[in-house]
């Protein structure tokens, strides 16, 4: 397990230096798409957190944060970004089970059943790979059954990420209401109770969104209420990925209980493109292009991509909100930085009607903005 090399060493820039204004200088770019989003930043609930990584002569890193409209108290729907901490805690829980003398690891085959319904046996590795490659809802929901809501929320609070709250599973999934019974290959039950203390998001704004919403096929002329939906603030979700990439920068009580092998496993799957590893099975379907599940850098590119630039990430897309939490690195040119952002693109203000400006506004914005940050980092490092 990781030992603390030194206490948390994070520098956050609040001054108005030229570099601090780099986010706004890009947002004010002449490119029409970026400028239009910036001019309507409140409407788009735009939040951006960009972190530079500086290293001293010995290679010790420190973080320098730049932020734009980041507000822990202003709600946005995190969607599938919640799957990142779910996967992390799954690996942590496997470590705990091994300490309790269970013979289990990511490659162990598990049986998954509910009443008369039985899924094909899978491994935790299979489930996690599906989550990172194609954001599989069903795989994520099995892991929620493995962890339990209360365990998840307690662990988030424990390491100082209390603005990440899990209240429900992911849809669409035909088996979303199944309380899966999970057993290891020794036929021992390893799933958790889904009994939960439902957490209401108090002291949080923007919990009612839209002018109308669709429910069970009918349009209701009232906002959609997110008080009991999943929650993840941009800063805390960004904190998850920072703990994965640079765990040594966090003191022991603020880290996940993971091994070096766990961290390497996470980094591998977070950075895969769809055409790599078992992802090749998905590329037979035209919707799963090479950079599927990557908004930053490649989001608006469905053709060949620059393999030198790796994006370690988990994105979310639902209810008109797009979010990406990422660490971006070019190993050949030694460029690396963290970038997390969320944007709301729902011009008609009707929630759950599947009419959102993802393809013509949200995704192109995130892709182009991140490329601009990348170019800035590239120039800064050389």
Annotated model-derived regions:
Residues 1-25:
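Bacterial Sec-dependent N-terminal signal peptides
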Residues 19-31, 219-382:
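Structured C-terminal helix/loop/strand segments within mature extracytoplasmic catalytic/sensor domains
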Residues 21-30, 43-44, 119-246, 250:
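Active-site-adjacent helix/loop patches that line small-molecule binding or acyl-intermediate pockets
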Residues 28-70, 339-341:
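A short, well-structured edge-of-sheet supersecondary motif
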Residues 43-45, 65, 71-73, 77-82, ...:
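Extracytoplasmic
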Residues 76-102, 339:
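Active-site SXXK
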Residues 83-90, 131, 156, 237, ...:
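Residue-level preference for non-acidic, small/hydrophobic
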Residues 92-124:
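Short, well-structured active-site flanking segments
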């Amino acid at each position: 397990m990781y030992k603390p090399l030194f206490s948390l060493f994070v520098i956050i820039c609040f001054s108005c230096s030229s570099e601090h204004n780099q986010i706004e200088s890009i947002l004010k770019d002449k490119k029409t798409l970026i400028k239009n989003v910036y001019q309507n930043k409140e409407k788009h609930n735009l939040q951006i957190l960009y972190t530079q990584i500086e290293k001293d002569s010995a290679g010790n890193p420190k973080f320098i944060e730049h932020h734009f409209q980041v507000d822990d108290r202003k709600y946005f729907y995190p969607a599938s970004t919640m799957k990142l901490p779910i996967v992390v805690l799954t690996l942590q829980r496997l470590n705990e089970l091994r300490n309790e003398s269970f013979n289990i690891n990511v490659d162990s085959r598990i049986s998954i059943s509910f009443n008369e319904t039985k899924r094909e046996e899978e491994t935790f590795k299979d489930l996690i790979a599906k989550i990172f490659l194609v954001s599989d809802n069903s795989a994520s929901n099995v892991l929620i059954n493995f962890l339990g809501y209360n365990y998840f929320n307690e662990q988030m609070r424990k390491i100082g990420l209390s603005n990440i709250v899990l209240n429900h599973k992911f849809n669409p999934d035909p088996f979303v209401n199944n309380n899966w019974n999970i057993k290891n290959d020794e036929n021992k039950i390893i799933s958790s109770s889904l009994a939960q203390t439902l957490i209401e998001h108090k002291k949080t704004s923007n919990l009612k969104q839209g002018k109308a919403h669709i429910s069970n096929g009918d349009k209701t002329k009232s906002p959609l209420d997110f008080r009991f939906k999943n929650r993840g603030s941009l800063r805390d979700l960004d904190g998850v990925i920072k703990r994965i990439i640079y765990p040594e920068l966090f003191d022991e009580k603020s880290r996940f209980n993971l091994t070096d092998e766990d961290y390497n496993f996470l980094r591998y799957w977070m950075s895969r493109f769809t055409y790599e590893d078992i992802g090749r099975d998905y590329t037979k379907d035209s919707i799963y292009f090479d950079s599927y599940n990557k908004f930053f850098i490649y989001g608006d590119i469905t053709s060949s991509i620059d393999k030198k630039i790796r994006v370690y990430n988990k994105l979310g897309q639902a209810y008109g909100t797009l979010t990406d939490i990422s660490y971006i690195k070019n190993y050949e040119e030694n460029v690396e930085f963290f970038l997390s952002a969320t944007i709301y693109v729902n011009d008609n203000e009707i929630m759950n009607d599947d009419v959102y400006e993802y393809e013509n506004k949200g995704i192109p914005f995130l892709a182009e903005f991140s490329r601009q940050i990348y170019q800035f980092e590239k120039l800064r490092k050389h």
